[in-house]
Amino acid sequence: MEVLMMEERIYTIPLRDVINKSVRTKRAPRAIKKIKQFLKRHMKAEIVKIDNELNEKIWERGIQKPPARVRVKAVKEGNVVIATLAE
């Protein structure tokens, strides 16, 4: 029987470069991709799932104005990372 280790970390992910380098109408989707890419690199996982709360926070002000940075709590179980909004 395998025992799965749960690893939990809190990150502040900067999204300003996505905002500055993207066309206005693609900022929020690119912010989501940036979060997934960041967590894949830092948590060394293949699959990253984003919680509904975090998704709503990114899309809160629409497609053109995602937040400049976001605090994320990442929980890794096996090869899957689940990202939620940190309090």
From Swiss-Prot:
* MF (Gene Ontology): structural constituent of ribosome
Q: Which InterPro entries match?
A: Ribosomal_eL31, Ribosomal_eL31_CS, Ribosomal_eL31_dom_sf
One BP annotation, GO: cytoplasmic translation
Q: Which domain of life is it from?
A: Archaea
> What cellular component GO annotations does this protein have?
cytosolic large ribosomal subunit
A Pfam family name for this chain?
Answer: Ribosomal_L31e
Q: Which keywords does the record carry?
A: Ribonucleoprotein, Ribosomal protein
The record's section on CDD domains has: Ribosomal_L31e
**Which family would the database say this protein is a member of?**
Belongs to the eukaryotic ribosomal protein eL31 family.
Note the NCBIfam families from the entry.
PRK01192.1-1
Q: How is this protein named in the record?
A: Large ribosomal subunit protein eL31
Species, as recorded: Methanocaldococcus jannaschii (strain ATCC 43067 / DSM 2661 / JAL-1 / JCM 10045 / NBRC 100440) (Methanococcus jannaschii)
Encoding gene (name): rpl31e
